C-alpha cells in the first residue's frame, strides 16, 4: 500500500507522519494561496502574533479552496479561525492521491472485485478531489504577517508566509 493512503480520512500516527514526511519533503512546490481551519488545540498551542515564526510540529494539511477550510473552522472545530497561507513550499496531496486512486480503480475494474471495494475507492477519489488538499512538511516554519477579524466571514484570519 502506498504511504499516502495512510492519510485518507483519519489522522495519522507519529510513525506514519515521519514516513509520509520522508516521502513528500523532496516533492514540494510553491503554492500561491492556501487555507486551513484551525483546531482549538492549534489556536491555544501556537499563540499566533504578528511577525512571530511558527514551526509546525507535524504534517499539516491545507486546502486550495477557502470554503473547505472555513467549514472546518466553523462547523467541525468551532473555532472560526482560518489561516491564509501564501507562497508556501508544499506537497500537492490531492493530485498525487487522485493518480494513486485512479490507478487502483483501473486495476480493480480490470479484474474480479467486489462492489464494496470499488465503491470505497470511488468515494475516496471524490473526497480527495473535493478537498483539494496540500501537505506542509513537519518542522516547516512560517511567519505570521497579519491577524484580523473578517466580519463578512465571521472568522479570525491569520495570514502567514
Question: What positions do the PLM features span?
Answer:
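Mono-ADP-ribosyltransferase
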Residues: 1-161
Amino acid at each position: 500500500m502506498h504511504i499516502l493512503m495512510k492519510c485518507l480520512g483519519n489522522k495519522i500516527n507519529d510513525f506514519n507522519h515521519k514516513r509520509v514526511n520522508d516521502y513528500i519533503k523532496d516533492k514540494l512546490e510553491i503554492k500561491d494561496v492556501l487555507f486551513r481551519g484551525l483546531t482549538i488545540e492549534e489556536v491555544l498551542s501556537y499563540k499566533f502574533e504578528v511577525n512571530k515564526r511558527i514551526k509546525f510540529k507535524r504534517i499539516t494539511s491545507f486546502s486550495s479552496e477557502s470554503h473547505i477550510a472555513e467549514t472546518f473552522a466553523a462547523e467541525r472545530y468551532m473555532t472560526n479561525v482560518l489561516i491564509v497561507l501564501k507562497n508556501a513550499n508544499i506537497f500537492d496531496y490531492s493530485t498525487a492521491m487522485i493518480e494513486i486512486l485512479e490507478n487502483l480503480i483501473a486495476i480493480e475494474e480490470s479484474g474480479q472485485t467486489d462492489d464494496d471495494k470499488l465503491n470505497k475507492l470511488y468515494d475516496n477519489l471524490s473526497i480527495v478531489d473535493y478537498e483539494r488538499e496540500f501537505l506542509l512538511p513537519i518542522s516547516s516554519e512560517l511567519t505570521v504577517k497579519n491577524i484580523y477579524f473578517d466580519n463578512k466571514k465571521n472568522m479570525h484570519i491569520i495570514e502567514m508566509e
